[in-house]
Amino acid sequence: MSSSILNNRSARSTPAGANPAFNPPAEASSSSTQSGVPYIRENSPEAESIPSNPAMTPIITHGDSLASPGGRNSEADTVVPLQPAVSQDAIRSRPGSRTGNFVTPKAARFSQDGAEPIMQYSSGSVKSARRRTREREDYDFDQAADYAPMSEYERYYRNEGRNDRDRYTRRGPYPPPTFMNRRRAPPLDSDEEFYSSDDPRIPPNDRRRMMDEEAGYPGRPHAFRRTSTLNGFNITTGKLQWNELSRQEKSEIMRLPLTQWMNSNFKNHFVAGVGEFIGTTMFLFFAFAGTEVANIQADTTNRTTTGESTGSLNVSKLLYISIIFGFSLMVNVWVFFRISGGLFNPAVTMAMLMVKAISVTRAIVLFLAQILGSMLASVVVRYLFPETFNVRTTLGGGASLVQGVFIEALLTAELVFTIFMLAKEKHRATFIAPVGIGLALFIAEMVGVQFTGGSLNPARSFGPCVITGSFDTEHWIYWVGPAIGSLIAVCFYWFIKTLEYEMANPGADGDDLNDPTKNPEKRAEIQASKPVPTAAFGSGKTASILS
């Protein structure tokens, strides 16, 4: 019965039967197939026991064959399962050849003839060939290389579709937003400026310093900005820049206690003034107290420190007074020069102002502090020690007014020029400048105590006169003489600075950093610090020589 039903079909008419690579299962006595239809051999007891019922599903036996188009029966002696009309090779992609990179695309959902793929001679369900997930090719904006590049401007502005999609797919009218591509490597085509633009939060390279470490600046964070465009609060350092604040912000900060005070120049001048006041007081206190000790047996009528008033010439007394003045200045300058500069002398203050080492405001503050410090030291020495207060300065030794003025002027010029070369000019031995300054005052006192009292300091002579209430007729020489001496020292300092004295004996300190012949930056600093510009000397040979 089964042979009569299927005698016109052949197993070789199916694609699987025609495929030589198909390997049928070794066991031919399988009880079932994928479709649930049993395979029964011809002339077997199972085949004889099956009743002939046309309505039943046909039973395929191995002896039966499917009719081929040529009418020849199959001679296969193994069971061949039926396959769908669409080949397995047509529904999976094949790799490309070795000579080309073209890959066969995946099979479409429909067969070549447009008909739905059906399973022949099977009663089971067939899974749809429709893809259940979207692949990378199903999305539009995923890589810049998928679009027509801007270099091919005709295709780009024609809005031509991608070549790996069907002809109905078009690129969208807008490019992807830049934040989607900011962290992606730039593409290899000419669209890199379009899809990978610079980060607007970072200034361009031509507007910022590329290597701040070379200039000694600290590194800034990635997104550096101030708290606002008006205030001056630096996030990196956390310091308040008072000069960069607006008037409204300053008024708001004024409400906080001591905020404006701690960020103003007034506070700095106040601290310098207090330091100068205390330093002058301590310097003159020890100097006046030592002078009191030296003049214990002196004449108490004149109350001066000159050699003539202290009785007969006593070298030991002159040496004692000179030593106490020199050492007192050395110690107190060494202590207070970090606070106020350790000037302790109105003549030195005027000289520093003339060479622009200090400002006018600072000079006025220091001058007042020095005068007050001299008066306080005089009060303390007068009422602290039981001896007579003999520390005023007057002319002695037969010196006239003119002689007294020039003695004070020359001695003050020596002291001021020593301060210029040891303290103002920065060098390797700047930190021991107080030693040289104290020794300069010591040798000046060795000469001046006998004839003028060795003042060299208007504040030193003014304080005792105020406390004793007696101003001598020659008191003015202790103001004019030191002022002239300061002017002499300033003029000579300008002269050697204009001629670049550093080049006359380079390397005298043994410091290559301050040697202009070995350090170009020091050479430029010397040329920039000339007190008189070269243009003031005119032009021509003179200007070239001085420059």
From Swiss-Prot:
Compositional bias (Polar residues): 1-13
Extracellular side: 291-316, 385-400, 450-475
Gene name of the record: FgAQP5
Phylogenetic placement of the source organism: Eukaryota, Fungi, Dikarya, Ascomycota, Pezizomycotina
Compartments where located: Membrane
Record-linked SUPFAM superfamilies: Aquaporin-like (SSF81338)
One MF annotation (Gene Ontology) recorded for this entry: water channel activity
Comp. bias (Low complexity): 15-32
Motif NPA 1 in this chain: 345-347
Broad class of where this protein is predominantly found: membrane
Stretches of the chain found on the membrane's Cytoplasmic side: 1-269, 338-363, 422-428, 497-547
Name recorded for this polypeptide: Probable aquaporin-5
UniProt free text on domains: Aquaporins contain two tandem repeats each containing three membrane-spanning domains and a pore-forming loop with the signature motif Asn-Pro-Ala (NPA).
Traits of the deletion mutant: Leads to no variable phenotypes.
